């Protein structure tokens, strides 16, 4: 019985990681002075806007808190789920943003991406 649980554990670990990283997507990276923006084809516009917003908010946030990250912060933009959310991982210097397309009909005129990038980067700093 222990062997059975061990095999289940190993298979679960192996397959959960490949699902999470979405190896079926072709990831691209935009490098700016302070950030590495990772995105896939469906989030190209979001990736480009993220790069502009992130650089715009970098100086005000880092000067306010008098702290700058030691290395470039990674921002990952994905559209693999039907949610809009963000998360900051301080120890990894990484921000994950689950974003619906910018031209989504129900989005309205609210600049959600600007707010979430500012909010999550503040957690990093």
Model-found features: residue ranges?
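Juxtacatalytic substrate-recognition/specificity segment
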Residues: 17-125
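Sec-dependent N-terminal signal peptides
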Residues: 3-14
């Amino acid at each position: 019985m222990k062997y059975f649980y061990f095999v289940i554990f190993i298979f679960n670990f192996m397959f959960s990681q490949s699902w999470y990283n979405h190896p079926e997507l072709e990831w691209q990276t935009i490098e700016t002075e302070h950030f590495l923006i990772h995105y896939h084809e469906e989030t190209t516009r979001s990736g480009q806007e993220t790069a502009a917003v992130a650089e715009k908010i970098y100086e005000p946030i880092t000067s306010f808190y008098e702290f700058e990250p030691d290395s470039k912060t990674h921002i990952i933009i994905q559209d693999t789920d039907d949610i809009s959310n963000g998360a900051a991982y301080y120890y990894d210097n990484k921000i994950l943003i689950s974003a619906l397309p910018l031209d989504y009909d129900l989005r309205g005129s609210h600049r959600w991406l600007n707010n979430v990038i500012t909010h999550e980067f503040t957690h990093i700093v």
